[in-house]
Each structure stands twice: as C-alpha cells, then as structure tokens.
C-alpha cells in the first residue's frame, strides 16, 4: 500500500484484452485502488478490432473464442453481456489438398481421429500415410516426460504424412508457428497427457470424445452478438476514465520503494505496482535499465508476423461456398494458411446472400508474402479461392490488415523461460499477456485474473511481515 497517504495506484501498460481484464479485476478486487490503463493507440482493445470493408464491418482479429475454456464466457456474464453470446451458424472445416478441399474428420479433437475406422479413411492421406498413423495404437509410449516439440510428438506417434498434411495445418495455424519448434507442453499439453495416460494419441482422442459426450459441453466457440469487440468495449466502459489512449510509455524505473512510469511526453506517474501488458519485445525495451536479466529473456520470445485479407463478394455468391466454416492449408501449399467463411459462420450478420471470406496470411517461415502490395495479396487469395470453390474471380470489396510481430512463439523451453522472467522482475512489476500463458482470449482472461490476484496480494502485504487485517485488529 502507498506509504504517503495517497491512494494506492496501479498502472497497467497496454490496453489489449489482457491489460483491460487485469485492470478490471484489480478494480473489482479493491475499489479503493486507483487503476490507470495507458494505451498508445487511439482506442483500446489491442488486436480485437474490426475494419470497414465496403458497407460491412468485419473482424480483423479474433472473430470468436473457445467456450470450453470458461474464463471469457464467465467474464462476459460478469459484464452483463452473457445473454448476447451466440454460437457459429456452421460447424466443421475442410483441409486443402492438391485435389481440392476434403472434409476434416468429425469428432477429431486437435484434428486427430478417435476411431480406427476414421484413421483408415483419413481424408487427404495416402494409404501408406494412414497405415503409418494407425501404428500409433501399437507404438510404445515415450518414457521421458520432459518437454519436446509438438512436431517431435506428432511425428513419433502418427508419422510425417499425417502430421504435415492433416494435423499441423490446424494446430500450427493457431500459433502461426513451426511445429518443429513449438513446445508441446506450452501449446497442447493434452497431447502429451494422452500419450502418457492412454499410450496413444488416437486412444486419447477417443477418451476425449467419450468425456465430451458425457458432459454435454455445448458449442465449442462463441462470441457476443455483433463481434468480440463487445467484450473489450464492455471492459473499457467499466474502467471509464481510467483508460488513457494516445499515451506512449517510454520507461519504467524504481524510486523510493515505488515505480515510476515515464511517458513519451516526459511526464511521469508514480505507482505502487506496474502491470506490463504489451508484447514481450516492447516490455524488453521498457525494462532494459530496470531489470536487464528479465529484459534479455523477454527479448528471447520471438514473434511471427501475420495478416488477414477480408473479401466481400457479390450478392448470390454465398451459394458457391461448401458446408462448414472454412479450411486449413498445409505449410507452404497456398498463399494463405487458412480461410474462414464469415458469411457461413455468422449468418445472422447483415451479409445477405454475399459470400464473405477471411484469408489468413503469414506465419513462421512464410512472412515474405506480407511484403506484397495489398492489391497483389487480394488478387493471390481471390485467385486461389476461385480455383477451390464456386466464387467469382475477384471480390467486390476487400481490405488487408497486417499484424507485424503479432503472434508469440511458444518454442521449446517456453514455460521455463516465462518462469525465469517472472523470478527476475523487481518487486511491484508484473507481466501479463499473450506472450506468457496462452494466446487465446480465454487464456488471456484467466491469466489476467491470476495477475490481478498477485498484484492485490502484493499491495496488501505489510513490510514488517504483519498482514493488513492483523494490523487493523491491533
């Protein structure tokens, strides 16, 4: 707590989902704390935002979030927008192959079939690839329980063909990453548990399906009606004047047992705690002088640059789309890494009979495409879609949104790296965000709650070792 009689102040640097949710949780835990959120851009929300494409407003960031991780859904309910949550109007996805799109197996968690019959009819694989994948049921499990790459686990269990053609396009796409560098423990720990407990990924998928049928989990993905922006807008409304936009932070220093945040205009804010919720490379620059060891480790978290190409087609074009919500692409096989049919996924939006597509471009090892001009990116994606499905050669309206250094890479050793960063931070400094504990919105919300709890506990400590409650009693 502040020792000079002023209100206890907490500064949150960064107004994305993580920063807003952490500030909200701190404010709710102790309304007496003066919380201020500093956001460099003209609006909070981070990568959760929409853009105008013709007469439509379309998501350039997340268009939904995982409902089976409950934290974002719970936050929506807490904010009074829980009754606005809607599920997609279509389900299922396709896999790109050289011969066209093929439907991905149903009831295949993480893209892995839970039935041997599905394995031997696995779309997109050769007979040899299917037979190799089926050996997962016979191969001995790994005895060493240390971390390994996602690619190492998948290739050992299912073989290269099933890994590269069928599973990696889905899993690696979520991180825009390289499966042979991503940590399985930091990205998809369930896969490691499946091998350990079931001795097989196929049996693990089968067990997951049985559990899912027992628990009736409901829709896998949801969003507030009107878009995910509703969540960040609701958080911003709750925080009110605590959120300051157009505010660049230059540095963080420690002085007299408190933290001092220096802004880009040279003014300073003294705080009892600072929560850093910007990218790891930005956090590294802020802490170069204050915590050089932490800064060096933060700089070691690499990022992939990505982008989206949003395309609105003419009236009547929706009929040319296949069933499902879109497709994923094996590494390097097409200009895009995946595509979503927004008009199929969210039919309640005002699309009419127009097909609306969102193509994802850029990933680790595939970032050069982002150097292309907007018109060339649009033309490349549109040409590829027209060859795959019954769409016109070009959309009526289109937009390109680039996200430079946007997706943190949870490479082998990521969990140890994050633990080391947090151990080396000075007292009163906390980090939270996509770079540390999960890239999806539910994981960011969960981590925000944990960070807020840690901040409040830190502020309520007594330097003499006596809790505030004990001091009050005395």
Give residue ranges: language-model regions:
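Conserved Rossmann-like nucleotide-cofactor binding loop
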Residues: 18, 43, 281
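Dinucleotide-binding Rossmann-like beta1-alpha1 core, especially the glycine-rich loop
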Residues: 54-141
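Mid-domain catalytic core of redox enzymes
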Residues: 247-357, 363-372, 387-388, 467-474
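Conserved flavin/dinucleotide-binding core of flavoenzymes
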Residues: 3-4, 8, 50, 105-107, ...
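Short loop/edge segments at beta-strand edges and connector loops
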Residues: 87-89, 245-247, 253, 433
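Active-site/ligand-binding neighborhood in enzyme catalytic cores
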Residues: 131-251, 259
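Glycine-rich FAD pyrophosphate-binding loop
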Residues: 27-54
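N-terminal Rossmann-like FAD-binding beta1-loop-alpha1 element of flavoenzymes
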Residues: 8-37, 456
């Amino acid at each position: 707590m502040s020792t000079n009689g002023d209100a206890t102040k907490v500064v949150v640097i960064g107004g994305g989902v993580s920063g807003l949710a952490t500030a909200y949780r701190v404010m709710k835990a102790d309304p007496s704390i003066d919380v201020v959120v500093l956001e460099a851009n003209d609006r909070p929300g981070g990568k959760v935002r929409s853009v105008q494409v013709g007469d439509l407003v379309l998501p350039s960031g997340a268009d939904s979030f995982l409902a089976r991780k409950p934290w974002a859904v719970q936050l929506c309910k807490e904010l009074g927008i829980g009754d606005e949550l809607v599920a997609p109007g279509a389900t299922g996805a396709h896999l790109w192959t050289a011969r066209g799109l093929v439907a991905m197996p149903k009831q295949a968690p993480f893209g892995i079939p839970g039935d041997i019959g599905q394995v031997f009819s696995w779309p997109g694989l050769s007979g040899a690839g299917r037979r190799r994948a089926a050996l997962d049921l016979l191969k001995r499990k790994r005895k060493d329980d240390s971390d390994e790459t996602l690619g190492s686990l998948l290739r050992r269990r299912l073989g290269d063909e099933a890994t590269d053609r069928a599973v990696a396009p889905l899993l690696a796409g979520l991180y825009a990453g390289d499966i042979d560098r991503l940590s399985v423990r930091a990205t998809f720990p369930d896969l490691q548990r499946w091998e350990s407990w079931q001795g097989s990924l196929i049996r693990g998928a089968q067990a997951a399906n049985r559990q899912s049928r027992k628990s009736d989990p409901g829709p896998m993905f949801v969003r507030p009606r009107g878009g995910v922006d509703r969540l960040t807008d609701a958080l911003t409304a709750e925080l009110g004047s605590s959120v300051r936009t157009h505010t660049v932070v230059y540095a963080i220093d420690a002085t007299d047992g408190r933290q001092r945040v220096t802004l880009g205009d040279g003014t300073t804010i003294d705080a009892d705690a600072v929560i850093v919720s910007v990218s790891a490379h930005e956090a590294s620059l802020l802490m170069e002088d204050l915590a050089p060891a932490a800064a060096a480790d933060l700089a070691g978290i690499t990022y992939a640059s990505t982008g989206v190409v949003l395309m609105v087609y003419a009236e009547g074009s929706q009929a040319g789309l296949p069933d499902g919500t879109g497709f994923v692409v094996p590494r390097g096989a097409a200009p895009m890494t995946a595509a979503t049919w927004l008009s199929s996924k969210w039919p309640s939006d005002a699309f009419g009979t127009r097909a609306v597509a969102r193509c994802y471009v850029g990933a680790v090892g595939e970032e050069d495409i982002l150097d292309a001009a907007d018109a060339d990116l649009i033309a490349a994606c549109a040409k590829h879609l027209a060859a795959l499905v019954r769409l016109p050669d070009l959309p009526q309206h289109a937009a390109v949104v680039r996200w430079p250094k946007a997706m943190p890479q949870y490479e082998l050793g990521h969990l140890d790296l994050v633990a080391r960063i947090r151990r080396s931070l000075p007292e009163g400094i906390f980090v939270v965000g996509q770079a540390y504990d999960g890239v999806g919105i539910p994981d960011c919300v969960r981590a925000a709650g944990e960070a807020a709890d840690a901040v409040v506990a830190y502020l309520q400590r007594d330097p003499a070792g006596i809790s505030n409650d004990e001091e009050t009693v005395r």
